[in-house]
Curated annotation (Swiss-Prot):
Organism of this sequence: Bacillus pumilus (strain SAFR-032)
BP GO annotations: methylation
Binding site for S-adenosyl-L-methionine: G53, E74, D96
CDD domains: AdoMet_MTases
EC number(s) on file: 2.1.1.-
The protein, known as: Uncharacterized methyltransferase BPUM_2363
Keyword vocabulary terms for this entry: Methyltransferase, S-adenosyl-L-methionine, Transferase
Pfam families: Methyltransf_25
Length: 213
């Protein structure tokens, strides 16, 4: 899953929850309506959920609170430790978007929040192909992540971040693999999914991809 970012996850584990709470000005808009975004994923998820990039367990906790059956996949030991320290049940397993243990149930939904951009477009295609083979008809993928309408919109946000002095945000936008909606839609459709996209703030969209018959 772009494990080149693993050291970043380990470093970020202690402060991640402060960031998503809006305490970091550079990422305030990225995480605006964070709790609403998580609730929307939970609302769209089925009963048996495979979650990638569990992180500190915020989405995991929301899914469990809604009585979902959850199998979490997370590559960072520090992130998993932070989740367990918050009292979240240990449903976490080592792995990533591309390499992960099989859950003990047949998932009807695959979810992720703020993580799919760690894969290149080619890796995204590989991952979605794998998920297509896991899910039955009417199964779905629900991902929330930073994405852009097109490359021009992506570049505009980079320029805006630099103008505001948000150097870390600008660097993230330039170096990580944030998808464009048209590319992501094409990948899903080629793998047998119908998609809908829902904008949640200036950066984050939720994509809901349903597997066709």
């Amino acid at each position: 899953m772009g494990r080149e970012f693993l050291s970043l996850f380990d470093h970020w584990a202690d402060s991640y929850d402060d960031t998503v709470s809006g305490h970091d000005e550079q990422y305030e808009e990225v995480f605006r309506r964070y709790s609403v975004i998580l609730k929307e994923i939970v609302h769209r998820a089925g009963q048996h959920v495979l979650e990638f990039g569990s992180g500190t367990g915020n989405l995991t906790a929301a899914l469990l609170a809604a009585d979902k059956n959850v199998f979490g996949v997370e590559p960072s030991d520090a992130m998993k430790k932070a989740a367990l320290q918050k009292g979240i049940p240990d449903v976490f397993h080592d792995g990533d978007f591309l390499s992960f243990p099989a859950p003990p149930f047949e998932p009807d939904t695959i979810v992720s929040s703020y993580a799919f951009h760690h894969l290149t477009d080619e890796e995204k295609k590989q991952a979605i192909h794998t998920y297509s083979n896991i899910l039955h008809s009417d199964g779905k993928i629900v991902f929330a992540d930073t994405m852009f309408q097109n490359q021009s919109a992506h570049q505009a946000e980079i320029d805006k971040a630099k103008a505001a002095g948000f150097d870390q945000l600008a660097e993230d936008l330039e170096t990580e693999y944030y998808p464009s909606i048209d590319v992501l839609k094409q990948i899903f459709e080629e793998e047998g999914f119908s998609t809908s996209f829902h904008q949640m703030n200036d950066f984050v969209w939720i994509v809901e991809a349903k597997k066709r018959e």
